[in-house]
C-alpha cells in the first residue's frame, strides 16, 4: 500500500510536516509495510514559505527591509538551493499585520521591501521565484517594489514621483533602463487567489482598499489615480494588463508583476502542488491523506485539502482528511473528493489543551492508526 500524506498546518499547533509525520507514525503502527511519502502543503498564503522550507530542505534567509510605513522590518524568505528557487510572501515585507490599525495610510504605504527581498534573492543566485501576495498593506500599484528593482517613476518635471498611493497620480514618465538585469533570467510565479481587475468597482481600491485604510471619500480618487498609472504603464511598455484577472491583487502588485516582470499568476494551491511534486507521487498512490486545522464549508470551496483531493481523484486514490475540528458544514467536502474525514480530538478539553503541540501530535497519530486499521 502506498500512502501519500499532504496536510496543511494546524496553525498554532503543528506545522504541515509535523502533522504529516505524526500521521505517518500512526499509519506505520497499523500498516508496518506501507510505503509512505510525506509532502508539505500550503495554499500560497500565510505559512507557505515556512512549509516549503521545512518540507523541501530549504534554507531560511533572514534580512531587514523597508517596511510598509518606510521603517525597517525583519523579513524572511526560503532558499531552495537545488532548484535555485526563492519562496517568499510579500506580507513578510509589506503585510498589513506590520501596520497598527491607527497607522494605516494607503497614500504612504509602500511595497518597496518586496523589491528588496527579490533583489537579495537574485544576488544569492535565485532565478526561480514562488511569491505569495496575500495580506498586503499597500495600494501603490507595485510602484515601491519596482523602484527597489530599478524602475524610475518620474513626474511632469522629471522628478521622482515618490512612493505609496500618493505617487500614482504623479507618474508621467517611466524609465525601465535601470531594472535589475538579473530579472531577465528570472522565472516568477505568483500565487494569486483573487480575480479582481486593477480598477473599477471590483478593482483593488474599491474591494480591498478599506481594510488598508482607504476612506469612502478616497475611493474614487485613488481608483482614478490607479487607472492613470495603468495608462502610463501601457504607453511605456506597450502592454495592457489592467483588466487581467488578478491584476488588482495586493493593491495592484499583481498588475506590476504582470506588466513589468513577466510573471504568471496562478492559484496558490495549484502552484504549491506543482512545486512540491505531489502530482508525480499521486500517480501510483492507493490512499491520500490531507486535512487542516479546521474542516468546514470554506474547505469545500477550494482550500488546500480539496485541491489535494481533486488531484488524487484523477488517479483514483482514496482520500482521507484529518482536522483539529470539524463542523457540520464539512460534509460538503465529501462532494469535493474527500471520501471520509475525521476530527482528531479524543476527549473533552479546552482549546489551549487541544492546540498543545504534543497533544495534537498524539491525537493525530492515534486517529491515523485507528483509521488505517480499517484499510
Which sequence ranges carry the predicted segments?
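N-terminal loops that bind phosphate or other acidic moieties
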Residues: 2-133, 137-375
